[in-house]
C-alpha cells in the first residue's frame, strides 16, 4: 500500500470519509516497541472503533455463538463488518452455509472490496459471504423486510452483533430501542427456533440487560473473554452475551 504524502513510514492515513455518524478514518501504524507489528485502526469522530491489535473477542463472538447451534448448514448474520474478524471466524466454520454481513458505513465495505484492510480479499472471495450496506438496527426492527435485501422476511440460525460499545454505551441514541424487550422480540422473530443471538460488549456483564434478554430468549449468559493487551502489558476483558431463541 502507498503511504499518504508527508507521513512517516510508521504512520499512514489510508482513507478519510465524512459520514452521517462523523468523520471516518482508516489508518495504519507500525509499532516499533512491539517488534514493528503493523496495526490497522478505525476511528469514527472521537471514538476508536476497532484495532487489528485486539480482535480476540470479535473472533470469540462468532466461535461462541456458532458453537451453540445444533446441526449444520447455518445461515448467519453479522451486524458490523469492522475489520472483518467476526466475519472471517464465521466463515472458517464449515457448517456455515451463508453469511450476510451488514454495515451502516459504505466506506467500511469499500475497504474490504478494495483490499485496503488485511482480511478484505479473503472475506470477499468467499462465495458464501455477502456484504450489505444497511442499517442493522432498522432492519432488526422490521421483520417484514429482514436482513437479506433479496429475500424479505428471511430467518437465520444465528445473529452476531458487534456495533455499539455496549447495550448502554451506544454509537447513536436511536439504537437504544433495540436493546429493550420489544426490540429484542422483533429481532427474535428473524431467528429460527433453537437459533442464537450473540452480542459483543466492551463493558462488564450487565445484570439489567441480561434480565431483559431473558424475557425474550432462553439460556442467556454473559461470558467474559480475556485477552492480553501488549500496549498496557496486562490483560483486558470484554463480554459476549449469548442467548437461544
Residue ranges and their predicted role:
Residues 163-164, 200-204:
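Short strand-turn motif at the edge of the Rossmann-like AdoMet-binding core
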Residues 49, 198, 205:
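Glycine-/small-residue-rich active-site loops that bind phosphorylated ligands and cofactors
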Residues 191-197:
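Short glycine-dipeptide loop
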Amino acid at each position: 500500500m502507498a503511504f499518504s504524502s508527508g507521513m512517516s513510514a510508521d504512520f499512514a492515513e489510508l482513507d478519510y470519509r465524512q459520514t452521517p455518524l462523523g468523520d471516518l478514518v482508516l489508518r495504519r501504524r507500525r509499532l516499533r516497541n512491539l517488534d514493528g507489528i503493523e496495526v490497522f485502526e478505525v476511528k469514527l469522530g472521537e471514538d476508536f472503533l476497532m484495532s487489528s491489535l485486539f480482535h480476540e473477542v470479535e473472533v470469540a463472538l462468532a466461535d461462541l455463538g456458532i458453537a451453540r447451534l445444533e446441526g449444520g448448514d447455518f445461515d448467519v448474520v453479522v451486524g458490523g463488518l469492522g475489520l472483518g474478524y467476526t466475519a472471517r471466524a464465521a466463515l472458517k466454520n464449515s457448517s456455515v452455509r451463508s453469511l450476510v454481513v451488514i454495515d451502516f458505513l459504505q466506506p467500511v465495505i469499500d475497504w474490504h472490496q478494495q483490499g485496503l484492510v488485511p482480511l478484505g480479499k479473503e472475506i470477499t472471495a468467499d462465495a458464501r459471504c455477502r456484504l450489505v450496506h444497511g442499517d442493522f438496527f432498522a432492519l432488526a426492527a422490521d421483520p417484514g423486510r429482514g436482513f437479506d435485501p433479496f429475500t424479505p422476511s428471511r430467518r437465520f440460525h444465528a445473529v452476531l452483533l458487534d456495533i455499539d460499545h455496549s447495550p448502554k454505551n451506544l454509537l447513536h441514541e436511536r439504537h437504544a430501542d433495540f436493546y429493550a424487550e420489544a426490540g429484542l422480540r422483533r429481532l427474535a422473530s428473524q431467528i429460527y427456533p433453537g437459533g442464537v443471538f450473540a452480542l459483543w460488549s466492551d463493558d462488564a456483564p450487565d445484570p439489567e440487560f441480561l434480565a431483559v434478554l431473558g424475557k425474550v430468549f432462553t439460556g442467556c449468559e454473559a461470558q467474559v473473554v480475556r485477552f492480553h493487551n501488549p500496549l498496557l502489558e496486562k490483560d483486558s476483558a470484554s463480554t459476549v452475551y449469548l442467548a437461544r431463541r
